[in-house]
Amino acid sequence: MLVNKVIGLLGVLFATRFTNAVELDLDNYESLQNATSLIAYGLMDYYTGNQYGKTVGMFSDPYYWWEAGGAWGCMLDYWFFMDNDTYNDEIIAAMIHQAGDDNDYIPLNQSTTEGNDDQAFWGIAAMTAAERNFTNPPENEPQWLYLAQAVFNTMALRWDADSCGGGLRWQIFVWNSGYDYKNTVSNGALFHIAARLARYTGNQTYVDWAEKVYEWMVGVNLISNGTYKYVYDGVSIDDNCTKVTSYQWTYNQGLLLAGSAYLYNFTGSDLWHTRTKEFLNASQVFFHDGIVYEAACQGPNSCNTDQRSFKAYFARFLGVTAQLVPETRNQIMSWLNTSAIAAAKSCSGGTDGHTCGLNWFNGTWDGMYGLGEQMSALEVMVNTRALDKPAPYTAENGGSSVGDGAAGTQAQPTNLAPLNITKGSKAGAGIITAVIGISIVACALWLVF
C-alpha cells in the first residue's frame, strides 16, 4: 500500500506541474483516473488530521465534524470506483479515531455539540465501508458494520414519541439551538441507514424501523404525495409539527431516494419500487440542462459552507440507486455524465489550475472553492462508473464486516439529556436562531421574486 501511495502522489504532483485544468473524457478510463486523482488531491489539501497537534479525522476550519464524515464517505467512493488506495490509511485512521470511546460516533470532542444528522453521516460512511468490503480494521478495533449499527441504535433510542407523534429532533441535546426542530436530514438518515442495514443483514427489524420513520415523515408532510415525491426541510414542535419549512435540498432528496432503492432491492416490494421512481421524478427539480445544482441557494449565491457539499451526497445516492434499481439507470446516468463533464470544466481555478467551483453551468471556474466543492465534483465524476462496479455487498454476498445487533446500547444514553439552561445560554441560542431565521427569509424572498 505504501508503494501505491507514493506512486499515486507522484502521479498527482506530475499532473499538477504540467496540467492547468481538469480534462475529462468519460469514454476513457485513464482520463477519468487522472481527473479524479487531481480532484482527490485537492480535497485532501483541506485535511489537517495528519499534522502535528491536529485531530485525526478532522479537516481545516471552517469545516465541521459532520462534513468530515461526509468527506471520508467520499474518499471511500474514490477508492472503490477508481481502484485507487492512495488515501486508504487516512480513511481507516480517521473513521476509527472519530468513533469515540463507545464506538458510536459520539467522540468526546463532539459529545455536547453534535446533532443526530452529524452522527448519521459518520454512520453512513461506516455503512459504505461495510457494503464496499473496504479493508477491515484490526480485530481489536470496532468493525464497520458494528459502527453503523451503533449509530442506528443510538439514534433509534432518541425517537421522540412525546411530541408530534414521533420523529427525531435535529439536536441531541436540549442546550443546542434547533432542539425543537425535527428536520428531514436526521429522520431521512435514520430511514436511510435502517434500509441499508436491512439489506446487508437481512434483519426485518430494520425494515420495520424504516417504514416507521417513513410513515411519520409522510404524516407531517415532509414528503409530498403524488407521483413526484418532493422532500422538505423540517417541522417545529412549537406548532405541533403542522407548518413545514419547505426548502428542498439535494441531500434530503437523495437520502429518501436511495433508502427506497435499498428497500426495493431487498424486499422486492412494488410499493418501494414505485416510491423510488417517484423520488427520482421529483429529483428533476435539481437539474438544469441535465446539470445538477443546489436549487435553494445556488441561484442567489447564498449557499453556506455546509450546503456547498450537498451535491456530493446527492451524486453518491444517485449512483447507488442506479446500481440497485435497473429502471432508474438511463435517467440517472444521463444526469451524472452530463454533470460530471460540467463539473470538470469548473475545476479550472485556483493557483493549481484545477480547483473546483460551485456553479457548473459556466463552463469555467466561478471563483468559489472549498472542501464541499471538491467533494461534489469528485462524487459526481466517480459515480459515472456506478454501472461498472458491483452493487453494495451484503453479509450473504461478499460482505465480510462483522457487526452486533446490540451495538451502541451498552453506552450511557444520550437521549434528550437534561441541562439547566441559564438566561445567557437562552440569549445566545436566540441569536443563533435569529441568524438562521434571517437566512431562511432571505432565501424565501429570492425564491418568490
Swiss-Prot record:
Signal peptide span: 1-21
Lipid-linked residues (GPI-anchor amidated glycine): G428
Cystine pairings recorded for this chain: none
Record localization: Cell membrane
Catalytic activity: Random hydrolysis of (1->6)-alpha-D-mannosidic linkages in unbranched (1->6)-mannans
Keywords, in A-Z order: Cell membrane, Cell wall biogenesis/degradation, Glycoprotein, Glycosidase, GPI-anchor, Hydrolase, Lipoprotein, Membrane, Signal
GO cellular component entries: cellular bud; endoplasmic reticulum; plasma membrane; side of membrane
Glycosylation sites: N34, N84, N109, N133, N203, N225, N240, N265, N281, N337, N362, N420
Single biological process term from Gene Ontology: fungal-type cell wall biogenesis
Pfam family, one: Glyco_hydro_76
Propeptide: 429-449
Lipid bilayer topology: Lipid-anchor; GPI-anchor
Entry EC number(s): 3.2.1.101
GO molecular function terms listed in the Swiss-Prot or TrEMBL record: mannan endo-1,6-alpha-mannosidase activity
Top EC class of this enzyme: hydrolase
Domain of life: Eukaryota
Function field: Required for normal synthesis of the cell wall.
Other comments on record: Present with 2580 molecules/cell in log phase SD medium.
Family label: Belongs to the glycosyl hydrolase 76 family.
Name of the protein: Mannan endo-1,6-alpha-mannosidase DCW1
Species the sequence originates in: Saccharomyces cerevisiae (strain ATCC 204508 / S288c)
Source lineage: Eukaryota, Fungi, Dikarya, Ascomycota, Saccharomycotina
